Amino acid sequence: MTIAVAMSGGTDSLFALVLLKEQGQQVCGLHARFIPPTGHDPVPDIRAMCDRLGVDLHVVDLTEAFEEHVVRPFMEDYMVGRTPNPCARCNATMKFGLLADAAAHVGAVHLATGHYARLLRHPRWGTVLQRGVDPAKDQSYFLSLVPHARLEKAVFPLGNWRKEAVRGELARRSIVPPLPSESQEICFVPDDDYRAFLKDRRVRLPGPGPIVTTRGRKIGSHAGLWQYTEGQRKGLGIAWHEPLYVVGKDMENNMLLVGGREALASPGCVAEEVNLLVPYEDWPAEVAVRIRYRQQPLSARVTLRDGRLYARFREPQPPAARGQVLAVYDMEHHVLGGGVILGPLP
């Protein structure tokens, strides 16, 4: 039974390969080209490392599909004022979609990645996604949109590891990753400058408009709604007698809505594109949710109605950004499901 390991050239995927090989698993490397190389091509270095480890490497070109399923929706989200989460979309459609298909094509039964998350077996639910043990690196949030059937074929060797231990173990083995530095936040956006990326792609974005308080008073002008995110404080360019925050976007009237801290209190949010990883009838009444990465889980009650998730927070929170992911957990840190945030509770 062969396990294909998705090889980016970085620390995590390399150690995932090393771990599986040392466990006696039959493995091969699988590298996906998601974006055309603009500088140094990592493939020769990845191939050399695989040769050193005695592992075959397969390379698959997915640049056109990545443009269609990840880059284009990313640009379209900004055009309508959403704050997209391309990593979650990539995991669902590319890594555990088309790349998993490529793994099967080369004869692999499973696809392993360097994600910091765990997969467990449950007597009723089958494969269950759970948070990784390293709270600083846990990536279950970004995996909550991956269909359950795809997770059945996934392997996460690093789920019980901490990042520093991974680095230390590679160093102890005198293995240097071809790309040792941390990858940037959005792999296809140079220098993580999404504003420059969108302008370079000549994306037609909403123009300037008024900044209006929650009481209806115009107090300035914004540079385009696409440049702001719900809950944002810095970068508004307004001198005011109290700190101001983005509390919403009126796309129809091209208005940026701002208010003081008290205006941030949101009772909950609604999510669409729902992905259930545990049958909804088995969800507990009280769950934990995350509406952004690196956030402590929030106590909430979540209902599924008409194909959407309605999350009501136990305590009001800053508004959830439209386009981000709502991930739902039980108290044992199992991921129950996820969705794409549509807006605040009606």
From Swiss-Prot:
Residues the record marks as site: Interaction with tRNA: H115, Q324
UniProt binding sites for ATP: A6, M7, S8, G9, G10, T11, D12, S13, G114
Main location: cytoplasm
Ranges for region Interaction with tRNA: 137-139, 292-293
Disulfide bonds: C90-C187
UniProt keyword annotation of tRNA-binding present: yes
Database matches in InterPro entries: MnmA-like, MnmA-like_C, MnmA-like_central, MnmA-like_central_sf, Rossmann-like_a/b/a_fold
EC code: 2.8.1.13
Gene Ontology cellular component list: cytoplasm
Active-site feature positions: C90, C187
GO biological process: tRNA wobble position uridine thiolation
Transmembrane segments: none
UniProt superkingdom: Bacteria
Pfam families according to UniProt: tRNA_Me_trans, tRNA_Me_trans_C, tRNA_Me_trans_M
Keywords for this protein: ATP-binding, Cytoplasm, Disulfide bond, Nucleotide-binding, RNA-binding, Transferase, tRNA processing, tRNA-binding
Physiological role: Catalyzes the 2-thiolation of uridine at the wobble position (U34) of tRNA, leading to the formation of s(2)U34.
Family: Belongs to the MnmA/TRMU family.
Name of the protein described by the UniProt record: tRNA-specific 2-thiouridylase MnmA
